[in-house]
């Protein structure tokens, strides 16, 4: 974008990000933990036939969304450190903003789809294979990504309608919309309403779906006579509810509450939760609380160890013969 004169102002061609932390080692460690944890979940679900169910199909895409969400923010921080700069171009800022909005929405709607999956599994177990067939799962996933695309378009379009005259220092570690609005010298009322409505709609709809699903799940669990049934049903929902509480709490604070109700520094701290901390914790939450994932991980590790030992003994035997 070329510099354009507007009265006594000059349109900005880029922004300076004030950053999250000056410790490059911490940046690398956090990013590698996020990548390795979520990538491990995806690979485990793909290679383990015991996990080829709709629940884990959605979980693998949740891990992908976490990984991609963090990757849309963190690598830029690392590159800026390596070249000793904290700048991002106008186009780069728009891409980063749209990517973050896309994957945040994908995670929102995925959590609702996972709640529906748990609802069908617990409340209608005999019809589960029909109601959550491969075709239905793919259709739900298509809705997830379409919703993400629409929200991303609304964010990037609103961004391009803003005029930035200076200063260009963004008090954030990535191009989030709230700190960008503070730098705009144009009317932000329409953009604020549009984005609050679009983000709020996604949050309200998905929260309602999750709430209704869990109300029916709770009613079904309370009707169960078996203590073992109670424990099994609750254990399958605990990890999902934990992730839902963490994620929706942070994004509601950022994207739904009015900007004047919190400071930019508070915005930055809360943003760390959903861009860094939550993507890092999600694999741990689902792994530690899910017996099927722990069992699949143990089976794959044992299989790898046994196959390695078999190859070793085979080579040893061949050497002895020769």
From Swiss-Prot:
Keyword hit for Acyltransferase: no
Q: How does it sit in the membrane?
A: Multi-pass membrane protein
Please give the residue ranges for the topological domain Cytoplasmic: 43-50, 117-135, 214-233, 289-322
Q: Output the PROSITE patterns linked to this UniProt entry.
A: G_PROTEIN_RECEP_F1_1, G_PROTEIN_RECEP_F1_2
Side Extracellular, residues: 1-28, 72-95, 157-192, 255-267
Superkingdom assignment: Eukaryota
Q: Which GO terms describe its molecular function?
A: G protein-coupled receptor activity; odorant binding; olfactory receptor activity
Query: Coiled-coil intervals in this record?
Result: none
Which SUPFAM superfamilies does the record associate with it? Family A G protein-coupled receptor-like (SSF81321)
Any Pfam family hit: 7tm_4
Q: Which residues are glycosylated?
A: 8, 259
Q: Which cysteines are joined by disulfide bonds?
A: 93-185
Q: Name one GO cellular component term.
A: plasma membrane
Keywords of this protein's UniProt record, alphabetized? Answer: Cell membrane, Disulfide bond, G-protein coupled receptor, Glycoprotein, Membrane, Olfaction, Receptor, Sensory transduction, Transducer, Transmembrane, Transmembrane helix
The record's subcellular location field reads: Cell membrane
**Residues annotated as transmembrane:** 29-42, 51-71, 96-116, 136-156, 193-213, 234-254, 268-288
Q: In which tissues is it expressed?
A: Expressed in the tongue.
Q: Which function does this protein serve?
A: Odorant receptor (Potential). May be involved in taste perception.
Q: Which family does it belong to?
A: Belongs to the G-protein coupled receptor 1 family.
Protein name, per record: Olfactory receptor 5P2
